[in-house]
Amino acid sequence: MNIQVRRFQRGAEAEFVTGLEWLFDPPGSRPPDWDRDRAVERTAQVLADENVALFAARSHENRLVGVASIYLDIASVRFGRRASIEDLAVHPEWRSRGVGAGLLTTAKEWAQEHGADYIFLESGVARTEAHRFYLRQGATHAAAAFRWTIGQPR
């Protein structure tokens, strides 16, 4: 597989959001309150944060085929400094071709370079193929995740 993984730079916010929207393909779904313009604005805010990295995987034709985001999170008393992979999305035509592994490797390297002791990743319960991929990549099934919506999206 001939892909290159590089960090997104300012000005590429809309392209990153396009990659995120691949998460809406089955078995995923579009969130009911999804607003693409708001997502582009949030991506610009995220790109300005030094504790966050957004990555693009590109084919040899420079086509966007995958995206990932990772951020430094809490310093846990029990486990040390955590990095969280917020998003990892691969274009449907490029799945099972090494793109996700390339993005994951790059995100893990970034986390290690930035002092993280471990990486946390949540994945929707319906994404069983993604779960198998994460386990093949050496992850352990460590927790169940729960969510409360406490306000309106900004």
Q: How should each PLM-predicted stretch be described?
A:
Residues 54-56, 63-72, 84, 89:
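Conserved beta-strand in the GNAT
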